[in-house]
């Protein structure tokens, strides 16, 4: 009875409340740091985490600068905590080779956040395991040289709009932010190639497609919500998935409806009436496709080895086969949406960086202009294969640009099973982050890494280059699928521009460029130059 009396809330309410508060605070304190011993147990050095949020404040300047600092302080193997999630950062080429190639079967998937929403959740970027392999097999054959040639006229049409826009700045002689011009241009290309829609972004900024693109890329998660998601993922991630998000739903709904309407129209048309674009190429592969095995998935290796000749069609030796599960409409929509993300952000940033480097390195630009003039005499209407073979110095300039400023400067792989990588124990579920930027700026592999030097990428220099020290588009079976299309667009764009103009630095040109590193690496304040008629 005395015990019951002691527990009676009427007699001891304040004491019970205080005891519960103490227990709750103790549990909260334990929870706030309980996840932060795993890196130490693995013997991986890392910055000291803060309760709940881990090392979130370490990245307040951006991932680019923080990766450089991690490499400087802790070497090519380090780690950090993103909220409660452990991330292992690698920039050692031998370890990267193991993860991306030799032990790829254990590192097939990218990191899943649980926050992916349709339609991008159905893209090749986020598909996992067997379904990723099936869809990748289908899409690999969509990027053959023969099919890429069909896209060249669509890209050239958008180039004509860009050139007309640049002509005005050439006539005025004023300094301007060419990154904004490239934003409009890549929007036009994406609309035409992936969505079957013609737009002129610079003249029609309020066009629904253009407006929804702006809204999509302006979207960001409020800082408080991000902190809560990272601190309490088991509660906040499911909650974030079910709570309505009007802006996100409107943007996703617009692109979803647009693509589905185009698909419905194409299905009603005869084959010869259908527009030949990327969307149609994917639609043609919905039910059967050339059988392309995982060993043929490394599109990046094929793209960068093609300087010796036009790359072979990866689908050529294989016969069409029925898919175990045909591409769903959702998956077709997902690939088009991914094209928007990569085709806008990556291409815009790469064009901006190469323009800046040419403007601030006039000797390199002069050498490139001579090559462009010689090439144009031989190929007045260039196609994919001629662009691959005929512009070796442009290839060198682009390669060095992508070394200095890799737009996709980090990417992840997730361990499916416990394993060891060069003696380092990696538990199942561990996320490995490849720090491409830190790798590309490591003086051990790239002497004087801050200097723009296209001669690093002569044929002889590339033969001597250590494998897996240059990864602008990843490597291995899960490397960037659209690399050949991306390079085609960049080369074709620069070819069209440099036939008519040259880039010049001016007082408004920011040297060195300040960088912004959120989802991709980009110039923080644009790229201001002058453009001069030739």
From Swiss-Prot:
Instruction: Quickly give the catalysed reaction.
Output: prostaglandin H2 = thromboxane A2; prostaglandin H2 = (12S)-hydroxy-(5Z,8E,10E)-heptadecatrienoate + malonaldehyde; a hydroperoxyeicosatetraenoate = an oxoeicosatetraenoate + H2O; (15S)-hydroperoxy-(5Z,8Z,11Z,13E)-eicosatetraenoate = 15-oxo-(5Z,8Z,11Z,13E)-eicosatetraenoate + H2O
- Which positions bind heme? 480
Cellular component (GO) terms are: endoplasmic reticulum membrane
For this chain's UniProt record, which GO biological process terms are given?
Answer: icosanoid metabolic process; prostaglandin biosynthetic process
The UniProt keywords, alphabetically, are: Endoplasmic reticulum, Fatty acid biosynthesis, Fatty acid metabolism, Heme, Iron, Isomerase, Lipid biosynthesis, Lipid metabolism, Lyase, Membrane, Metal-binding, Monooxygenase, Oxidoreductase, Prostaglandin biosynthesis, Prostaglandin metabolism, Transmembrane, Transmembrane helix
User: What is the reported tissue distribution?
Assistant: Expressed in lung, kidney and thymus.
Classification of source organism? Eukaryota, Metazoa, Chordata, Craniata, Vertebrata
The UniProt entry lists the main location of this chain as endoplasmic reticulum
- Chain ranges on the Lumenal side, renumbered to this chain: 32-75, 245-336
- Protein name (record): Thromboxane-A synthase
